[in-house]
Amino acid sequence: MLNKTGNRLSAALLGYAILVILLLTLNPFYLAVPNRIGFTFRTDIRNVIFNIVLFIPFGFFYRLTLRRRGAFLLGAIISFIIETVQIFIPVRTPSIIDILTNTLGSGMGALAYDLVSTRITIPQSTVGRLRLETPLMGLIYLLVPLLWANALAFDAAPNRWILTLLISLCGTIVFSEIFKHWWETRSYRVSLNAALAAGIWFFIGSGPALTQPLPVLAIGLALMFLTATLTALPQQSKERRFERATLKRVFPIFGLYLLLLALWHPLRPLTAWHVTLGFTDRITEKSVQLLNPRIEYLVAFTVLGYLLAEWRGRSEIPLSQDLPRLFLFSSGVALAVEFLVGFQSGPGASLIRAVMVVVSALFGGTIYHLLRAHIRFLLGR
């Protein structure tokens, strides 16, 4: 039976994965009585790829955290609920094929974990680290839903590749540092393992964008090469706890990504400052594409909250004391960004968006504290 810290962490991670799936599959969140109730068998290759890839991390997370069977069945149940709700969303088309591919993806994710943990000959300590016993691994897992959301927006606007690249650079830095400290000796095999891990991570997260393979493949291959190169370089520090030094390199890149994401497209014409209450006032077919970048923005603030909490991890601040600080800092960032967005042509600043991203940041910080509590339990501290 899992300990309390493991149960809490599992619930938070699985809840986060399910929440992101719901955000991506149920937007624009507008319900209406349908003219016809039923499911279709129609689909296309893009939807097949997206639906499989979307549920792979869910199945992986399920086995990773709960270590129980049933990911296949649970994926089918969640997918059926989603497709049933889509009957009442005018711009959505519920499909039996979607249920089957979601279920397949969930099973593949669970199988991937089983293969890594039981079939591949790696030290048990490495499998332990894969199970989030290294705080930076939590960041790697949280970046996967961010890549999902980015990939959906990328598909509608290919010129957003720079945002995909910035997320990838964050992953590159984290993977290279983790592998450097997992293996003290430098060898081509360690660099190769780091590159393969980074590549698998990127292509799982960017699966929905594989319908435009050239830019995605280019970024993925560049990511793998850079990860291998950075892993082969000598360690800059011999400290056992290397998270803070790694975060110093991640923060500038992630900060630039967050700013560009909020202002995208940054070259839009300027106008008088203006603000709106909600996200959008249009519920049309195009609204799905308009909302995808906004969902990416919410997910990005969850990652920001995790980064901020991990930055102060050494101080051992309890969650109750850290939440007010997270609230103040994330509120300051959110309001500063909305102030800048208000001068751009278009919807302008959004009060609802500012509130929602602060909540997202608090959730990200909470995940870090749950993870840290679980690590302390595993270490007997």
Language-model features and meaning:
Residues 1-97, 103-381:
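Bulky hydrophobic segments
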